[in-house]
Amino acid sequence: MNKFVYIILFSSVVCLLSACGSDKEEMSRLGDDDAVWVNLDINVSLTDVMHSGITRAEGDGYENAANGYELMSTLRVIVVRPDNTVEENRFISFRDVLQHYGDERFKVRGRETKRVYLFANENSSIDIQSEDGTRFRLKEELERIKKGDAFPTETIGKLTVNLDGGNQLKVNPNYVPMNECHTVEVGDTDQKADLFIIRAAVKYSFYVKNESSHAKTVTGYSVHNMARQAYLLPRDVRYRDVEGSDGTIYKEIEAFEVPETEYYTYRFNASYSLPKNKEIILAPSCYFLEGKHVYEGEGGADEKKNYSVSLWVDGAELKGFLENVPQLPRNTHVKVYITIKNTSTDWKVDVRPYTEVPLEPDFGL
């Protein structure tokens, strides 16, 4: 199984106002005299999310983050009370990119159901757009949300990420955006809440092998049917728990929603020499938005043809369909393996989510 999971650990230390005489002045400042106040110690880690309709790569191999741009550079945690009041809005910037962060303490009111919004890498230069078409920087929009104000639920929920022209997401040096929203029951006793955050991107990588009798020149590739627009936050997403071979429980995406959007073809031009009996990796990998493109041919819809790619070799286009990819949810890595033979081309696709990667002492930016 290919795993991702961003786990946020909430350690809640409950304190009744009547039992905390030394904190009486602080509690009075925070709210009602009979309120229960809880310290939430937040711990964030990576884990794995997968779409249940996709055929996974063979085995239980993990897909590590390939570089620091796929990890966390910043994190924002917004806690919202049941009456839609913003209880906390905290921005955290890391000295190095991280796959784990913890022990960030929040004092919140207990005995309530909270919404917890998570935003990582909000400094990325992605194009964010509101429902009315206004474009702005995500960081500036999130900074406008003040503690004690009403949370703009509808506005934030309808924000979209947009790609113009034939572009891909620019993640270098801007990092992959990540986000999620969770509902958390906060009681009046110590507790934990395991949460996760996922990348708002789909990644493509290409591996080309030449088994023909002649050297080849690869001049680029095309990725077809990419969405121009996707929701910033996961929209109407449903997860289910799946047990891996090691007994660990992971998440699979059963359903998700996308806005009405156009689809386009991304073209990457280059020049690679490919000797016979050699394999090359077409660098760099590219990043796109999640989507639900539907192929409509003469025979009607065919989910085995929803997504396709092209490889340009010696001036000719070789095209293949990704038959095991009916939809493209966020947090997915599509690895396309292409084998060129004398009279044919073989296509194989592995689809993997990312998973946690141990950080070495010299890892980071």
PLM feature segments, named:
Residues M1-A19:
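Sec-dependent bacterial lipoprotein signal peptides
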